[in-house]
Amino acid sequence: MDEDAESRVSSTRSYDRRGHLDWLRKLPDSLLCQVFLNLPTKDVVKTSVLSSTWGNIWRSVPGLDLGYGDFPEYNAFVSFVDSFLGFNSESRLQNFKLNYQYLRLKYEWKWTELDNANVTRWINTVIKRKVEHLHLSDVTFSNPESVSLPCVKVMYLDMVKFANDLAFEMLISGCPVLESLTIKRSACDNVDYLRVCSQSLLSFTLVGHCNEDMVKEQVVAIDAPRLEDLKLYCHETASFIIKNPASLVKMDIDIMFNLSSEQKFDPNDLPKRNMIRNFLLGISGVKEMEISSHTLEVIYNYSRCERLPVFRNLSSLHADFDDYRWEMLPGFSKTPGEEPISILPGPQCNLPALEFVDILKPMVEKETELKLMSYFLEKSTILKKLTLRLGDFRGNEESALLKKLLTIPRLSSSCQVVVL
């Protein structure tokens, strides 16, 4: 590229940047604040150098998002939060994200009563400003006399510690319009019986800790009659109790009920069997499910001594079968009124709701996996698309396999088979 061309390109880029900046400068402050709401507070403050009219606009953004490396020292952090919350104190605050975790790691201080007092004071302030999104990381809640978060719709608790079970329960019950709750647990959060009781909750995600040395058996109890989307990723929780599950639509589960290779499922443990039975019954009405190989193994072991429930509404299943348990799939899709469920795909039953099947693992065992393909194609009444992947086959083997696939009859006339 010659010098004139390079100069033209450079000028064009410079003009584009100026044009975008000029366009932003013309936006009204109210709209700018909504744009800046999606940025970390540190970056919003930096925008003050871009325009003389933006010097203090960061103070008017209806949200605070503070993280790692934002402050040279702890006192500066406290002073900044106080200053921000004190400005426009009568205006509504949409988001409040406070991350103590990285600050603690950076400055190596221990949690003190002063920290408790600061967090309590800030939360009381954002409550008055009708905060809707509350994101807290690595803070500690003392035992409150009462909790009232009347406007909080979204709550994210990351490694948050509580005085006891009751303190957590009061926090959740104090949010009458809560719609989305995400919890990433700490091994020392002081909550053994985690009870989520909410009349408004629509989505709940629970991520467990990685401490395999837990002695106490932890329990999670969910009573949320409007809950539609449930995600559980926690191996260490021993018991799950789901009340009022009728509204559940989607589930993503990676749980082991505190079982392991050392502590396997015991068919003589009747309380554990009853709990798993009730859990499976509670989730059997879902339409979409993702399930891990860990959970499938527990269910498989359970199914050898108890009948599995009917998942009559299931239309989408993403299952990680690892290297085994392909034969479990029919158990998730049986129609009502059949004989007790067999793990083998023998019974004559259709899949009335299944529309899409995507098998992510490449085919390597032709006979076993061809039976699986046959099951889906021959039993799915409204199947639209089946996608599969081939492993490393020789040319002749691959050609023979594809011919066999083409000869499998399809119950659904509109079904398309895609081979990747």
Swiss-Prot record:
- Any signal peptide, and if so, which residues? none
Q: Which Gene3D superfamilies match?
A: Ribonuclease Inhibitor
**Matching CDD domains, A to Z?**
F-box_AtFBL13-like
Q: Which InterPro entries match?
A: F-box-like_dom_sf, F-box_AtFBL13-like, F-box_dom, FBD, FBL13/AtMIF1-like, LRR_dom_sf, LRR_FXL15/At3g58940/PEG3-like
Give start and end of each FBD domain. Answer: 341-390
Residue span, F-box domain: 21-71
Name assigned to this protein = Putative FBD-associated F-box protein At1g78730
